[in-house]
A protein has these predicted regions:
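Active-site helix of classical SDR
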Residues: 133, 166, 174
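Residue(s) in the substrate-gating loop at a strand-loop-helix junction
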Residues: 152
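Short C-terminal tail/terminal secondary-structure segment
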Residues: 2-6, 102, 234, 245-259
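Amphipathic alpha-helical dimer-interface segment in Rossmann-like NAD(P)H-dependent oxidoreductases
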Residues: 82-86, 124-142, 178-179, 238
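Conserved glycine-rich cofactor-binding loop
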Residues: 18-22
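Substrate-binding pocket helix/loop in short-chain dehydrogenase/reductase
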Residues: 106-119, 202, 210, 214
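Short, small/polar-rich loop/turn modules that mediate ligand/substrate recognition or access, typified
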Residues: 182, 187, 244-246
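Catalytic Tyr-X3-Lys loop
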Residues: 112-130, 148, 170
Length: 259
């Protein structure tokens, strides 16, 4: 992949939501390795601080910052926007909407509890993506801005109830934004991971038996790792992908059509 040395160009500003752990941290690390100005967002300040310190140590030529923000809360997103303008500057080059997650609710839960769960899943995975785009859209570089949304294999394969619905919504939003923003020189794409180890997503639900079963259904015969997703995002944010928009890059080792 062709890259331009940061000594020969202005460092880009890259915002990564859910940037403190797993896939988000790997994505941030890929851009930090290029010497970019990387901003991590998340809900846990202590996790973000540790991640930023680690990434800064690994990439001393980068500038790694963090800001605590729940992207599903409009006031917090607006607060982040104001902080960004004050501390970083008026232009964002790359926005990676990675924040999200899944939780479960018992099938016999009261309707009010089920509704709260549904709104929480939609908020963290879909509404948060929309709010971040809405808030930062005036500041995205034109032309050359990049928006990359993290969806999931669940958007097409199912599984996870409201999580699947939310991630399918992320794809719909991606397609709509790509059409709207293309004339302004901004590309919008999605990455849909399959099973990715070394993340907080599966937690205790990823037993050795379940992992072995999933790997057996995956043509590449291995699980994914955060670096696999980071490489896909890094490509979509590069000059090599300047004519790629409205696309979904499936990074699942073939699990989508596994046999």
């Amino acid at each position: 992949m062709m890259t331009q040395d940061t000594s020969e160009r202005e460092r880009r500003v890259v915002v990564v939501t859910g940037g403190g752990t797993g896939i988000g941290r790997a994505i941030a690390g890929a851009f930090a390795a290029d010497g970019e100005r990387v901003v991590l967002l998340g809900r846990r300040a202590d996790v973000l601080a540790r991640a930023a310190e680690r990434l800064q140590a690994e990439a001393p030529n980068a500038a790694v910052l963090w800001h605590r923000c729940d992207v599903s809360v409009p006031d917090e997103v607006e607060g982040f926007r104001q902080w960004l303008l004050s501390e970083v500057g008026p232009t964002v080059d790359v926005l990676v909407n990675n924040a999200g997650g899944v939780s479960s609710v018992p099938g016999d839960a009261p309707l009010r509890e089920a509704a709260a769960h549904a709104w929480d899943i939609l908020g963290s995975n879909l509404v948060g993506t929309y709010l971040m785009v809405h808030a930062l859209l005036p500041h995205l570089r034109r032309p050359g801005g990049r928006i990359i949304n993290i969806s999931s294999i669940a958007a097409l394969r199912g599984g996870g109830g409201m999580y699947s619905a939310a991630k399918a919504g992320v794809l719909g939003l991606t397609y709509s934004l790509a059409g709207d923003l293309g004339p302004e020189g901004i590309t919008v794409n999605a990455v849909a991971p399959g099973m990715v180890l070394d993340t907080e997503f599966f937690g205790d639900r990823m037993t050795p038996e379940r992992e072995a079963r999933t790997v057996a259904q995956t043509p590449m015969r291995r699980p994914g790792h955060p670096r696999d997703i980071a490489a896909a995002v890094h490509y979509l944010a590069s000059d090599d992908a300047s004519f790629v928009t409205g696309e979904v890059l499936h990074v699942n080792g073939g699990w989508l059509f596994g046999r």
